[in-house]
């Protein structure tokens, strides 16, 4: 997400928050926490405080009016009710057949709340040099962390990767086979964004960039001749990322129709666009997630854009056997994160031997 857009969204959330959350924000900004982290925390607080109002724990008219005493007097039972609410609420994503958010999402929410409670009960000082209150209910709330070995994780992930010929096969399917299954109306809709969709998916498969890094690319960030993109990594760090050659024709096809198809002006700097009511806008992450889910489910198995990142990393490690190279490609500071791909490749090698 572009810094200016991120700051705009942070400001909107800050306008909703109680004064003690705003103090927390300023304190963590001085650490410094990244704007991305603080934005994610503010979204979690918005979700929590909205539930506080809906459940009647506070009779305040709006989130900004919720008094500090509500957090001070929050019981363990109240917090467990919030966790149950998260587990049972309908999912707001492309897969609507499941109920409740994942344990990973719940842990992220509780982590944000734990950070806020620690600040209020230990870190902040009032005029007397004391914290605002001492009772930290979050210390009584248990979180369940998913435990699995790298080998187990590799086994779970590898079925959702497009390895070997499946990378090009996936792109060919979208380009040639998927349209044959569509009604005339659906085909018309597909053709409007066919080149863009293929370019995005090809880029994800050929570079391994994160979804946020891809959707925030500007036209000037793509060097088609050198097959390099300039991205903004986590922590707002700029990085140059090599792109595999197989993505080039898909990017060229998209660029050939981009200006006319999406009615661009000079001010439309985003690389990947969507057209809404005749006005071009930067495509958002949610749209790409739904697009990848739709195409991948029809092709083989429903996956997320992050699985396309795993696909590139696994293929690159298989070709080079270099964790350092894979780490650099993914933008990781350590090779520890790439240990997963050694296990996936080992399984692939075993399967190859078994087939001899």
Curated annotation (Swiss-Prot):
Write down the Pfam families for this protein, in alphabetical order: Phage_int_SAM_1 (PF02899), Phage_integrase (PF00589)
Q: Which residues form the active site?
A: 210, 234, 306, 309, 332, 341
| Activity regulation (UniProt) | FtsK is required for recombination.
At the top level, the lineage of the source is Bacteria
Coiled coil spans: none
Instruction: Report the residue ranges that make up the Tyr recombinase domain in this protein.
Output: 169-354
Single Gene Ontology MF annotation:
tyrosine-based site-specific recombinase activity
Biological processes, Gene Ontology terms: cell division; chromosome segregation; DNA recombination
Q: Which UniProt keywords apply?
A: Cell cycle, Cell division, Chromosome partition, Cytoplasm, DNA integration, DNA recombination, DNA-binding
| Keyword Cell cycle belongs to the record | yes
Q: List the GO terms this entry assigns under cellular component, sorted alphabetically.
A: cytoplasm
Where in the cell? Cytoplasm
Q: What does this protein do?
A: Site-specific tyrosine recombinase, which acts by catalyzing the cutting and rejoining of the recombining DNA molecules. Essential to convert dimers of the bacterial chromosome into monomers to permit their segregation at cell division.
Report the sequence similarity comment from the record: Belongs to the 'phage' integrase family. XerS subfamily.
Which PANTHER family does this chain map to?
A: PHAGE INTEGRASE-RELATED (PTHR30349), TYROSINE RECOMBINASE XERC (PTHR30349:SF77)
Kindly provide the name given to this protein in its UniProt entry: Tyrosine recombinase XerS
Source organism of this protein record: Streptococcus pneumoniae serotype 4 (strain ATCC BAA-334 / TIGR4)
């Amino acid at each position: 997400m572009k810094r200016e857009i991120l700051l705009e969204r942070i400001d909107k959330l800050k306008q909703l928050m109680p004064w003690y959350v705003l103090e927390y924000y300023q304190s963590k900004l001085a650490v410094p926490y990244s704007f991305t982290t603080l934005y994610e925390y503010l979204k979690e607080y918005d979700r929590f405080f909205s539930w506080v109002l809906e459940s009647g724990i506070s009779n305040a008219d709006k989130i900004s009016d919720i008094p500090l005493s509500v957090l001070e007097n929050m019981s363990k039972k109240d917090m467990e009710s919030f966790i149950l609410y998260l587990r049972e609420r309908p999912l707001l994503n492309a897969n609507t057949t499941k109920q409740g958010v994942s344990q990973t999402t719940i842990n992220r929410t509780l982590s944000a709340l734990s950070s806020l409670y620690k600040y209020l009960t230990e870190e902040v000082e009032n005029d007397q040099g004391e914290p605002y209150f001492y009772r930290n209910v979050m210390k009584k709330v248990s979180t369940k962390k998913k435990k699995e070995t790298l080998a187990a994780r590799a086994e779970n992930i590898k079925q959702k990767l497009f390895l070997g010929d499946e990378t090009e096969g996936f792109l060919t399917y979208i380009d040639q086979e998927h349209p044959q299954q569509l009604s005339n109306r659906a085909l018309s809709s597909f053709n409007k964004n066919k080149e863009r969709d293929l370019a995005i998916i090809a880029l994800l498969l050929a570079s391994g960039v994160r979804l946020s890094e891809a959707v925030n690319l500007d036209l000037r960030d793509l060097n088609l001749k050198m097959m390099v993109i300039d991205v903004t990594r986590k922590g707002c760090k700029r990085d140059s990322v090599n792109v595999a050659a197989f993505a080039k024709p898909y990017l060229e096809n998209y660029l050939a129709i981009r200006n006319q198809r999406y009615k661009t002006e000079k001010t439309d700097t985003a690389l990947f666009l969507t057209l809404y009511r005749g006005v071009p806008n930067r495509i958002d992450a949610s749209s790409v997630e739904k697009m990848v889910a739709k195409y991948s489910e029809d092709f083989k198995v429903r996956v997320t854009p992050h699985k396309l990142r795993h696909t590139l990393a696994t293929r690159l490690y298989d070709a080079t056997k270099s964790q350092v190279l894979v780490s650099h490609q993914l933008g990781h500071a350590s090779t520890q994160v790439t240990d997963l791909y050694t296990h996936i490749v080992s399984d692939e090698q075993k399967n190859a031997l078994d087939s001899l």
